[in-house]
Amino acid sequence: MYRGCLAIPYMRWSPWRNWSVAAIRYRRLDDGKPKYMTMPGDKPRLYNTVALTRYSRDMAITEGEIDAITAELCGIPTVGVPGAQMWKPHFRELFLGYRNVNILADGDEPGMEFAKSVAKTLPNARIIPMPEGEDVNSLVTSQGKDALLERI
């Protein structure tokens, strides 16, 4: 079932185990459906919560793990939400202490809807839209990291 998929580990902190794998999400590398799969019964959670443990005045949120990885590689502390409908009200508390929470919105209608739904729950949110038809990963892949950094 998961053969030929990219395994994306979701980590969590425990004082007894330090960082350990809490869940694994799988992304198909072919064009098959569904594009993403999780273990049965898994609950929505944030990807790359280790970013929340590092000192930073600003934090970014993306829709999806690949965009979060790409933004992190560009030097932007970023967590990912595993889909446009997966932002949960209790996530809000994790972001209230930041100067800005930059929501790196995909350049399409669902991406803007995701960004708006997150932004309305955070008083420190700023929506940073990607160009039409682009997401963080495709923008950096086609134009380089400066294209992303200049938007912020």
From Swiss-Prot:
Chain ranges of the Toprim domain: 57-137
InterPro entries in the cross-refs: TOPRIM_DnaG/twinkle (IPR034154), TOPRIM_dom (IPR006171)
Gene3D superfamilies: 3.40.1360.10
Superkingdom assignment: Viruses
Signal peptide interval: none
Pfam families to which the protein is assigned, alphabetical: Toprim_2
UniProt name for this protein: Gene 57 protein
Natural source organism: Mycobacterium phage D29
Lineage of the organism: Viruses, Duplodnaviria, Heunggongvirae, Uroviricota, Caudoviricetes
